[in-house]
Each structure stands twice: as C-alpha cells, then as structure tokens.
Amino acid sequence: MDLSKYPAEPFKIKSVEPVKMISREEREIAMKEAGYNTFNLRSEDVYIDLLTDSGTNAMSDAQWAGMMIGDEAYAGSKNWLFLESTIKELFGFKHVVPTHQGRGAENLLSSIAIKPGQYVAGNMYFTTTRYHQEKNGGIFVDIIRDEAHDASIDIPFKGNIDVNKLEKLIEEKGAENIAYVCLAVTVNLAGGQPVSMANMRAVRELTAKHGIKVFYDATRCVENAYFIKEQEEGYADVSIKDIVHEMFSYSDGATMSGKKDGIVNIGGFLAINDEELFGKAKEIVVVYEGMPSYGGMTGRDMQAIAIGFREAMQYEYIEHRIRQVRYLGDRLKEAGVPIVEPVGGHAVFLDARRFCPHLDQEQFPAQSLAASLYIDSGVRSMERGIVSAGRDVNTGENHKPKLETVRLTIPRRVYTYKHMDVVAESVIHLYKHKEDIRPLKFTYEPAQLRFFTAKFDYAD
C-alpha cells in the first residue's frame, strides 16, 4: 500500500466493540424479515455497517473526557456556551440555535424562511431537506451542474451550482418568489461531491444583487474544505480552518448535522446572521427541540461536539478520512465496478444502473443490490435512488432521479483499510454475478420518507 496515497490511521485504538459474521443462511432470513430494507436490520446481525456516517463515529479520548464535565442544567449550561463560542469562532456566524440533529435545523429554517408557493433553489435535493421545504409550502428547484447527474463523468467540484440556471430561475420566477438558495457542501446524493470556493463566491455575488439569502447545508463542510485545499488553485497552503471560515463568509446561515463532521453520535445546529430570523428560530426551537440553550442535546453531548468540530479541522484527520474512502473507490474502479466518479468525501456510491442493467428503475435495482450485498457478506449499505426520491406530492408518481445508487458510507475513525478490503471483495464478487440480483416490489410503502421503513419482496 502506498502510504503517501493512503495514509495510516492518525490515531491509536483504545477501545473496541466485537462484531461477528452470522452465517449466510441467517443473513438470508434476517434480510427477508427486514423486508429487503437494510434500515430494518438489527445492528447485531451486521458485520460491517456502512449504512451511514451519521452518528456512527468513534469519539476521541478528549471527547470522552469532555463528556465527564457535562453541565445538565435545564437552561444556561456552560457546555452550551462553549459550543456556541466554538461555532461562532470556526464558522463565523452571529447567532446559533442548537438542535438534536440536522433534521431539527432543517425544520426550523424551512419554517421561518419559506412562504407557501416560494421556490428553494439548490444543488440537488436531499431527502429530509426537501421534505421540510415542501412541508412548509416550498417548491424545490435543482440547479446543480448537469454533470452531477452522470455517474461516469470524472471532473472536480461536481457539486457546483450552475450559476446560469440560478440566473434564469431568478429571471423567470422573480427574486421575491425565491425563499433562499440551499447550497450543500458537500452534495450527498451526487456522490459526496464538493463545491468550489469560486462557485460559492459566484453564487453569493449573484444572490446579493437580487437580495436573495443563501443558506448552506454544512453537514460535511470540513470534507468540502479538504477538496478545496487539494484541488482548487490558491488554497494548497491555507489551513482547513481558514478555508471553512471563508466558505461560510459567502452565506447567510447554515443548517448542520453535527453527527458527521462533528464526529459525535447526536447533535446539530442552525446558524444565522439575520436578527429577525434568529428571533423566530429561538421561538420555534422551544416548541420542537427544547430550550435555546440545549435544543434537544445533553450538556455532555454539546461538550463533545464542540471538541469534535475542532478535531475535524486537523489536517491529518481529514486527510486520512478522505483517503480511506478513496481507497475503497480505487479498489472497485480497478476491478471495473461502476461507481459514481470522482469518489467523494464520505462514501463510495455504486452505480446501480450500470451494475444491474437487467433491472428497470421501477424494479428498484439499488434497493435489491443493497440487500444482495448484505446477504453476500454481512455488509450493510443504503439505497440512494428511486426509493429514496419518493413520490411527487402533486401527482403521486415516483420521482425518477438520474442517479440510482447504493451508498457505502464510511463512519469516521471506526474501520480500517482491511475492512475496506472485505467490502471491496464482496462488491466485486457481486458484480461478477450481477445477473443474480432480482427485482423487488413494495409490500409496505409509507407515505413519507418511505426509504426508512418500507418493506419489499422479490417481484419475480
């Protein structure tokens, strides 16, 4: 292994959790009982869990030490003051509202910033984000660059907004009818693709001319900053911390799930500069999350997430993080497995369209591929395609995204390169026998965010 290309873990392992591989017969039974939905599996039946990087991270000794000084006062916790000051320092925002996770922040922002019938422009949808926008009367418009919808195109900063699309939307709908621009850094469903600093700057310049606010989905902003440092001219010698600070200088606020780049198990926030919107958010957070000084988090969790934000911006940490994901992607590409290119920040996305060419999108190829991967090796992954996209709120028809993928999401500081080898070998084996992957049909379809709890069975 080339250690300059794939650096060793920049940490020592102090505590371990045993895992076991149950038999193939047991995995087949578990998958059937789960309705061929990996979300419904019991974690004890999973060998390597790549369902998500959200809240599945390993905390550091410093974070665990911080947990011991949790101030669990109902109001005015010292841990909240530490978290608030950390967010203001690192991200540069004037005001912060804590939430139990990113979804809580999405709910707050959508509630205070969208009027029914207004448009929300963004660089590709995300499941829960679009749900909250539509729930509050918003209409999502995808303005990501066209290349992001093609898994095979390998170009940098594939998550960029197409500024011409944004300008056209403003001309057609009117600036007053656009609630805000939602800029995700990175873009999850495009494959964890980053946004360039130049693009953030261009979006800011255009929206400022029209008085339109820009809010970031900051969930994996540190990963985005690494790509800027690695690939964008003028940033090679700039620290991750300074890159992050500049990124958010081109925004009016951000929602964030701290369960990713905060390297913790729970927590999030809404950060905002506008005084009036901040006041509204503080009123609503009491209803949905808790007091504005904890937002659904314990004091110990707030201490841990503040420490985690600082650790995430250490170069050695984020370099290993990105390179470990890239290692898995490189192994699959070398074997000819079709994936979303380039490899993004938090996951490797299998291109289920090319992986399962014998299945129509309405036969749920990504869902079936994820189920097959678990049966083959005990590796849990996540469908990110037509099932996740859901149905059109007006027509009831399935949204049909151009990308039909299976996400292999790498938790932070949890698995080693050897685990990545196990995953790669299983995926490669499946690809050699891809014709055995069978079509699925719904047996239970929830009305909202169906991918979480839906159940399926084989359709043939």
UniProtKB/Swiss-Prot annotation:
Q: Which SUPFAM superfamilies match?
A: PLP-dependent transferases
Q: Which Pfam families does the protein's record reference?
A: Beta_elim_lyase (PF01212)
- Gene3D superfamilies tied to this protein: Aspartate Aminotransferase, domain 1 (3.90.1150.10), Type I PLP-dependent aspartate aminotransferase-like (Major domain) (3.40.640.10)
Q: Which InterPro entries match?
A: ArAA_b-elim_lyase/Thr_aldolase, Beta-eliminating_lyase, PyrdxlP-dep_Trfase, PyrdxlP-dep_Trfase_major, PyrdxlP-dep_Trfase_small, Tryptophanase_CS, Tyr_phenol_ly
Q: Which UniProt keywords apply?
A: Lyase, Pyridoxal phosphate
> Which EC class, in a word?
lyase
Its cofactor is: pyridoxal 5'-phosphate
Q: Which GO terms describe its biological process?
A: tyrosine metabolic process
**Catalytic reactions of this protein:** L-tyrosine + H2O = phenol + pyruvate + NH4(+)
- Please list the coiled coil stretches: none
Q: Can you tell which superkingdom this protein's organism belongs to?
A: Bacteria
| Single GO MF annotation | tyrosine phenol-lyase activity
Question: Where in this protein does the record say N6-(pyridoxal phosphate)lysine is found?
Answer: K260
Q: What is its EC number?
A: 4.1.99.2
> Quaternary arrangement and interactors, per the entry?
Homotetramer.
Recorded hits in HAMAP family, A to Z, give: Tyr_phenol_lyase
Q: According to its UniProt record, which protein family does this protein belong to?
A: Belongs to the beta-eliminating lyase family.
Q: Which PANTHER family match?
A: BETA-ELIMINATING LYASE-LIKE PROTEIN-RELATED, TRYPTOPHANASE
Query: What is the name of the protein in this document?
Result: Tyrosine phenol-lyase
Please report the organism this UniProt entry assigns to the protein.
Clostridium tetani (strain Massachusetts / E88)
Give the encoding gene's name.
tpl
